[in-house]
């Protein structure tokens, strides 16, 4: 979920309730400090090897998680007011995108070099990038979503969110399908070649998170009151609803497993949960660390992902820490 910087930190913490685990608490097997002050947004590569972490006042760091090594430090300018509030890594891992309130930059993740600097027509709320950086999708505060062909410069404006802010976006690896969720209580899957919707998913609240499955067969949406649903993209039918308690308001991050059988989510209350896609039942829950251990504190989970070998879960939180968890915890529960 990508909203506006510090405002997002305050909003999500206020909306969330502190979650308590049903199972005995399992600690992470690795912990990495990625931000000294706090994190504004984060993304984890599909193979689980890298993380892109936007820090308060320090730009965005591209981290090698296997070595716990900062590979690149990227900034837009020297003005701390222009913080990087939205980030994403392409599915193939070759490109990354960072955005401040009105501009975005595409980066080569091998060399660290920038391809260019572009301006958006309105405030940026969310970003996504396709393989090799060929296509970019922007969710704007104006209610529009813009799909850009970075090779030809073609721009397609999608106006299907009734002038309400587009809070979350996702893009298929080939850039053909866009998935957008907005404050108009809608999530829309639409074709970027024609601009025509394929499926419209209505919600009872603002849509705060959308995510496409890796195989292109499933999708996930959630709102501000725990109405989290997994969908069949082919038919548009509901597969399952996550078994959330009424006070579990917001899901701030989501990622499907490679085979599409499991869903990983993150929430503002330090919560990382593993779900069964078919039933919507929670399989396990982990609790992320906070900045001040032993004292009351929260942590919004901004990114979650699976390791390439399928043995571990990865997370990045607003507390500035990346963590690694064992999936064996869920199997032995």
Predicted regions and their residues:
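WD40-repeat beta-propeller superdomains and closely related acidic/aromatic-rich repeat-like regions
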Residues: 2-7, 16-333
